[in-house]
Amino acid sequence: MPEALILPGMADAEPDLSTFENKTGLAEDMKFLASMPELCDVTFLVGDTREPVCAVKAVLASRSRVFAKMLYAAPSPQRKRETSTKENKLRLFLKRSSEPLLNLQNAAQQRTGYTQQLAPIPEPSGQQHQTLIIEEFEPDVFRQLIEYIHTGCVTLQPRTLLGVMNAADYYGLEELRRACAGFVQCCINVDTVCALLASAERYIQYKCTKTLVQKVLEFVDEHGTEVLNLGSFTLLPQHVVRLILAREELRADEFTKFQAALMWSKKYYDNNPNIDIKEILGTFCEYIQFHKIPANVLMREIHPLNLVPYAIIMNALAYQADPESIDPGKLSPNSSRQHHRHRHHHQSLPKIRKAKSQSFRTRRSPSERRSPNNAPNLTLNTSLTSGNGEKKRSPLTPKSPVMPVPESKSPGSSSQKTPTSLSRQGTLRASNRRKNSGQLSISLGTQGRRSPVGLNDRSPQGRRSPLFPSSGLRSPNDPMTSPTVRSPTGEPRRSSPTFSVHTQERRSPLGAVAPTDFGCQFGVPGTRRSPTSTVHVQDMATEPEEAGFVGLKRPSISLFTPIYFASEKRSPMGPIPPITVSNPAETYKSAEREREAAEAAAREKEKEKEKEAAQPQEKKSVMREILAFVRKPSKHLSSRTNRFANAFTRAESGSSGGPLIRQSTFSASPAASSTAAKSAVQKQMSEVGFEPKISQKFTHYAKMSLRLRRSTKRDDEEKEKQKQSSASGSKRPSADLSQTNADQQVGGSSDELPFELANVHFEKVGESYIKHERLRELQEPEVVKEEDTEKDAEAEVEVEQTDAAMAQFVEEVTNSLKVVALNGEGGTAAVHHFTRRSESREPIEPRISEERESDSNDLMIPDDMRAELVEILKAYPPEPVYVNLQALRRETEDADLAIAQAEAAALAAAEPAKKPLQCPTIEFEPPSRRSSFDPPRSPFLEQLRSPGVDTETDLINLQRLDSGGDSFELVESKWSKSSRGESSFDCPYSSRDTSFDVSISRYQSTSYEDQTSSFEIVDTDEKGQGRRAVDLRKSSIELVDAETFQRSGSSCGGRKSSLETHFDYTPTEGGGRSPSLPFPAMSKKQRTENFRQLHVSQFSAFSRARSPLSQQTSSNYSSRDSYDSSGSYPHGYGYPPEPQRSPYGDPSRKHFPLTVRQKGEEEREVRTFLCTDQRCASIFEPRPSSVLTQQLSTGSMSTPSGYTNGTPRIPGAAPVGPVPLPHPSAPLSSCGFSSGSEFEPPSPRRAASASPKHTFTFRIVMKKVDSSPEALCPERHRSRIIDRYRRRDSRRKRIHDAGKSF
């Protein structure tokens, strides 16, 4: 004690030499106690592992009152000894420790000690060795504590800091606790924060922990992004992760939060593989505000993972499109939590069901869900009304508050109620609903999915369409989530108005209603929500009244309402809800404006509509109204938002026949990952058939707006329909009627038609589907036409009348070579339309409904012409779908005569000044499973692979069926398959205005997993612009060095070097299609070709703007079209390449820029490329070289080998218009098609693409060029060429089938 007295003064006084202190030495020596068990008399078995920690009781007791009581206040050592049983001793003996030998000695010592103590011990003796169990602290923590007690020194470590602090507090070592608290201030950094938080889990019950954790969390808030990106973040306990993610102060963007949650989930999943990673991640989704993540990121990065409930993503997209469309509560973490939980429950369910049950925010309580109207329905939609009790959508309106009760009451609504109908989300709306819908009750709202129109009067897309002011209903956009918004998935979907997925639940397969029902429904299309349920993106701009009201008047024939034709078109497939997402900016604003105007007018109109709804109008009038309505959506909406919505919806009714795979083209906006949507659709198709399950892995990040594809099923259906109709005579009694109506209607509202993003109609191509397809096709035409007209209306108002009629006409008469001839007589436009249609008819030809259809709409035939055409068509048997290529060939040959006639007629009507080209709608078939493989596949291979494919027909059908699988292959029509197949898009008319609309599909269809390939089509749609001299649609695909992303070739214009394929596509002001350019007389084939190339409606092109095709991998679709094309436009986009002295003269050059003068209202130069490089063809799977490939339109479409020479193979191809091409026929060939013969050695690109991870980035440069086939090729030539192609294709196909070398 004297030292103790002396020490205090020592600091002040000079060192007192009489006092010697060696505290350091003492500490060092005392450390040996830990390593000398024989010197210790107490052993603590610490933690869960019971690790032994030895100590000296006297020291512990002297330093800590707690230990003194524990060790010396114990009633009897005997009792304590009892705890150290032989088992414990053995444990000590075996327990790992820093000094195993010492442990052994200790064990021996204990053994001897115990033997000595066997007799009752009156008092603890020095020999007695106590063993205590300490469970509160970890071994490392307790060891440090004992070290400090023995030596007075300890090294604090962030990992054990929290434990030591709490232990010091627990055992009364105040100095140590204070030291730890002080150390916390300096030890918290990005590297230690996770360790501190992880340790807090164990000591959360101690008061010291709370203070320390609070400091750590504050640090995390400040450095959120850094902390969330730490690998150690995955080691944190789940509740800690949730705590961090839920903090409002956390300074990290939502995507970073998502990534952190994903990392944690993956780590947890690795350790617990039996738990679905979706469920794991789902626990965090509620804390992530997905609506704050950019749409392109959502679709490119998050959606493809297929881990985040679709509803959440859709709600987020909808919110971005129109914040008003989503109830903020639905975006809030809490509500999302609940919804997520539901979602998780449903995750195993197909997406559609999930949507149904999980309308994300929307989920109402079950009771709510059962809102009186929809009680029977599962329509979650009612739950959707989550925000608005008042609006609980009646089952019908479950999603669409707009026409809530009244609508729901309408028979249509009852149909919604059908238990089967899952409300829009459910997509299984009972067919009866559909049937009910037949009842004209407009009840778009009743339609279960409220028709976007009805739902969102204001939102161009899904906002309740002005049509249905449902004055009482606030626009769905309003706090109440627009039902539309609720994506079918509904769960997470922040209801995006656009999103209004009018999932229309493609309720029961499209035609829950019997095919005949379609006819009925046709009358009441609105009621039966068009599977497409294109969200009426009626632009708010459109007068809400007109559009909205029209919709109402059409008894709920909403834009979305598919118009069923009388012909049976029942789709065997289950309904698939289309998902529409609108462009946030446009939608929101439009919605606002429209809502005010629309609500007032809409209320009035609504009343009228209700009355009208009560009285179904004549089919004709209804059709007319529908058409008018369809057209009505204002152009504003037709803007990206419209496209967006359209993308989600199926071609109006055109594809209604088949279930819609969840049409999810996410925001049509360039950034929006159309591709993602497409991929989703593809995957859905492949995985679920038509399950609305969107492939979560969009072809990774491949962005592409999906064109509504009339799936092969549809083609098949069409064929069947044709057969049926041919038997019955005019296949389209109702079609004619609708046509007429469409024409009339269209004429009126064509101006207002917004372009709809081509409704993506992915249908599983299956046997049953094929049949349905056919039926649907027959019935579809009007709808398609409507939809198309809507889409095209903007671009081609004047043409639209014709187009609408044409679309119907063509749809029904599709592939009527005869019709082509007739058309030539009737009018070039008609011919185009027919040709295009016939293409659609093509069994295999994929059709991008929106694009194509819009063209067909464009080609609406004037009433007078229509009448003539109808008569003519009636005279001719409907063109059969060629099941057999041979049959096709025969038909083609017959067609030659027709072509000749058509040419003559075409010459007469050669250049209808304003007839727009008719491009076939291109449908993308769902990727078949093959697609999922990285190696590029060609459709031909597909055929080869197809089991039992012996005949061309079989190949075609199988191909179709396969398409139903995973690969997203274009269904090629007969020609398209063989010759056209060359082009990325199989659709012969793949693009009329945008050559490459279709081409994207090929790229798109890479394996879902292929993360490296991203194909994004950016819409650079510039509606306002006049036509471009340059065809932006010309697309060249550039290979880009994966590492540097530098163009491998001279790419046009300084493209951003990125993984993106840029479709710098600026649709011409006409809306992408050249409204007034008449096609010169062309042979049908030419036409198809042209269509394929040229006809890409704005939609196709627009979405094309920029897509990171980034490292498209093996997709079959890798652009064969432009391997060398990348260099094709050495000049910037803006400069049409000057024709070369001799396009073929330059040996170094394979692609020769050709400037074609289009004969248009004004001559414009169209830049195209003539590819003489065989490699172009090689780039893709060798495809039969086929002139068909010529995409007259521009763009480097692969030129069939024939073109390689620079001379079109097509005899009929005559130079059209002033074409500065070396060869007269060059114009056709010059279209920049480059393709080599099928058997040429693989091009480097091809070789690279063969590897799963090729390093190319395809940059697809789309140049839009007003290239109407008229300019490029006279109409008659086109027709002739098309026919020729057909014949040739059938031959080639057979040859290829036989000679495929893959």
Swiss-Prot record:
Record's compositionally biased regions (Basic and acidic residues): 589-623, 713-723, 836-855
- UniProt feature, compositional bias: Basic residues: 337-364
Instruction: Tell me the SUPFAM superfamilies matching this sequence.
Output: POZ domain
Domain BTB, by residue range, is 40-158
Database matches in Pfam families: BACK, BTB
Q: Report residue spans for region: Disordered.
A: 325-532, 575-624, 648-685, 701-752, 834-858, 1045-1090, 1102-1163, 1187-1252
Ranges of Polar residues composition bias in the record: 378-388, 410-430, 437-449, 472-487, 736-748, 1187-1207
Extent of Low complexity compositional bias: 664-680, 1047-1056, 1107-1128, 1226-1252
CDD domains, alphabetically? BACK_GPRS_like, BTB_POZ_BTBD19
Question: What is the name attached to this protein's record?
Answer: Serine-enriched protein
Organism of origin: Drosophila melanogaster
